[in-house]
Amino acid sequence: RLKLNIRLSGNVADRHEPSTPGALDLSGVTSIIQQAVRYPGLTPTYMSNGSLGLGPKLQGTPISWAECASFYRTDDNRFKANAELAYTPLKGLTLKCVGGYHYGASNNYDYRCNMILGDGRGTGPSSLTEQMTSTVYKTFQLLANYNIQIKKHDIMALAGYAWEDERSRNLSGYRNKFPSDETPYLDAGGADGQLNGGGGYDWAMQSLFGRIVYNYDQRYLFETTARYDGSSRFPTGNKYAFFPSVAVGWRVSEESFWKSAPSLHFFSNLKLRASHGVLGNNNIGNYPYQSVYKLGSK
């Protein structure tokens, strides 16, 4: 009568790839590969004295870019936990409690070194852009489902409550002019020209809902549903709304007059259905009712 299901999953990813040096309009290992097939084959990466070649644009060559201290790194961590507890106190009645927790965090680092070429010039000031994002999603449901069959009558009733919540935060920072490629950390860069930013969002929704389905002899169908939903994405006074619906159906192919007419048997299952209801939609921005919504300082 009592059943518990738990599902756990996680993912840890650490991606590290070369990137281009400072002041170049290109970035990432894909750009390095693309430029490598376009550069003249006789362009030297190293001079006879071991220093880096200038390249046709005085910015080095794709090979020297791939070997320099620039890098792009992504640390991504994901965790999901879902649990379902089901209880059947009597025949036809099932009670369920469902919950879920999802966590995700991502850190991105884009470091561009100042690569020194053979004539002593640098490609541009070193710089670091760092971005951090974390998101937490939670959900909870209570469900009661009842099924009963009395001769030719089939009845199904469902009632439930649902709640979900998501919160996300992000933070970014930028600095340049690092004294050494051995310390690619924001606090090691120069304070002049530094940039920072951040943001986030929150949303939540809760619902009460129910449904009744009646079926007589697999021929006549009746269904009614009702929802009372509330969303944080709407302003005070308009957060909650009621959404009813009703539907009727007639499976004509189960009638005796249909089955007794061989000329109609090319329709193995013919059902007529009519429905009417009210729908809602909260797939909008998180703060559309705010004329101004800005985080920061002057």
Regions found by a protein language model. Give the residues of each.
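Surface-exposed loop/interface segments of Gram-negative outer-membrane beta-barrel transport/assembly proteins
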Residues: 2-78, 96-206, 233, 254-298
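Structured alpha-helical segments in the cores of large, soluble enzyme domains
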Residues: 206-216
